[in-house]
Amino acid sequence: MEQRSMHQASVASLSTLETNKVLKNTYLLLSATLGFSAIMAGLSMVMGVPSGAYIICIIASMVLGMFVLPRTANSGAGLGVIFLVTGLLGFGLGPIISMYLALSNGAQVVGTALGGTAVIFLGLAGYAMTSKRDFSFMGGFVAIGLMVMIIGIIANIFLQMPLLSVAISGGIIMLMSAMILMQIGAIVNGGETNYIMATYSLYLSIFNIFISLLQLLGIFGSDD
């Protein structure tokens, strides 16, 4: 009986060590990819890259993220792919940031969006890590919500309704927040063991929250 208890304790200890390792590697890689994206965004701003590059970079990064990254995530090549994906997203983001900086209150809008994104992520990450809850029950809600958002985005291309833009941006922030809780909860509870895929998921959530905050702040801070 005592040997069984010792064995169970040993297994639990190893599981905790593995979870902590995945969490640590995820945060380190996430920090590195965010920093690399910032450098690429700055580079594209200095180069004066046109805004059309945003769509091209988004499409290219989606193709890499959906079809290449999952196949390389368990090897060293996965690190190269994740930096390529996040670098593309950062490069495409540069013209968007330049557009907002051109506003009369552009620096304030961009700074507030950055700060808001950091507060949201750190708050959600802290809660998921301390509560150790399993947030997988939110998966259905997130999937349906994403489909609704996609339909709304397509519809608003033609409708051009500011109120719909506000609703879409707010909805995306909520959905991405839920995805952050789900992803970190999965790591903490041992459901996610690949730190490269975990980094990709968290990066996309942070990226979309930042873009959505920019849109909201740009709308409400507009002088029009």
Q: Where on the chain are the PLM-derived regions?
A:
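A hydrophobic alpha-helical transmembrane-helix feature that marks the membrane cores
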Residues: 1-224
